[in-house]
């Protein structure tokens, strides 16, 4: 993999790490919305082997606005092929570790509202080590999708009694630096971050949101 940045990497407060896969239609809008947040000190985009113009769009944005518009550094990390979202998130955490006090993991497809990061940062400053965004408006999804998701969480929570997963919680989370360090030390081949996070035992809070 290789990376390019619009400015030198410096230690910061909160980094946003976003996995990207075939998001050319929305990636520039995503960047703009993240950069509008005063809580964010760095945006790291991890391209997971996109086959469309995602990388071209990001590089074009860097060239056009990197100097004048991006007081927040925007870094592009390119994976050599499509490794999957878990691998992309881990690559981003590896890259960010040691440079910041907290990392926000978020999808770049705008299914997660970047503006919620302000509330996540506030919860973190009040002592939370993990802040998880939980959807509370799943009525627009198909009944089959809602039913299968609910079934998965019920079965998982019955089988694994040492941890409990929340239905509606995805990968949109803020992680403190100690949590990032703990996760990057776990090098499982087939990762399931939703299960690894509660297992680490750090103080966690949840924030509800609607799409």
Task: Please state what every model-predicted region is.
Residues 23-37:
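Short, well-formed alpha-helical segments that are part of the catalytic scaffolds
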Residues 99-111:
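Short beta-strand-to-loop acidic/aromatic patch adjacent to the donor-nucleotide binding site
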Residues 73-74, 79-81, 85-95, 114-196:
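Acceptor/aglycone-binding surface of glycosyltransferases and processive sugar-polymer synthases
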Residues 25-29, 52-61:
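Acidic helix N-cap motif at the loop->helix transition within catalytic regions
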Residues 18, 31, 40-50, 77-78:
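Short beta-strand/loop segment that forms part of the nucleotide-sugar
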Residues 47-56, 110-111:
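A conserved acidic beta->alpha catalytic loop
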Residues 200-211:
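Active-site donor/metal-binding and catalytic loop motifs
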């Amino acid at each position: 993999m290789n990376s390019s940045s619009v400015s030198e990497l410096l230690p910061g407060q909160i980094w946003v790490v976003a996995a990207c896969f075939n998001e050319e239609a929305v990636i520039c809008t995503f960047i703009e919305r993240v950069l509008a947040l005063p809580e964010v000190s760095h945006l790291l985009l991890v391209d997971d082997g996109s086959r469309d113009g995602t990388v071209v769009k990001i590089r074009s944005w860097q060239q056009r606005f990197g100097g004048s518009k991006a007081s927040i550094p925007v870094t592009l990390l390119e994976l050599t092929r499509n490794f999957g979202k878990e691998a992309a998130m881990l690559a981003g955490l590896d890259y960010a570790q040691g440079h910041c006090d907290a990392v926000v993991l978020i999808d770049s497809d705008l299914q997660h509202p970047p503006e919620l990061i302000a509330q996540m940062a506030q919860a973190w400053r009040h002592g939370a080590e993990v802040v998880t965004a939980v959807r509370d408006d799943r009525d627009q999804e198909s009944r089959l999708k809602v039913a299968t998701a609910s079934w998965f969480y019920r079965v998982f929570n019955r089988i694994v009694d040492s941890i409990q997963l929340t239905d509606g919680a995805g990968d949109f989370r803020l992680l403190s630096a100690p949590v990032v360090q703990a996760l990057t030390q776990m090098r499982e081949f087939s990762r399931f971050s939703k299960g690894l996070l509660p297992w680490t035992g750090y103080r966690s809070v949840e924030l509800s949101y609607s799409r």
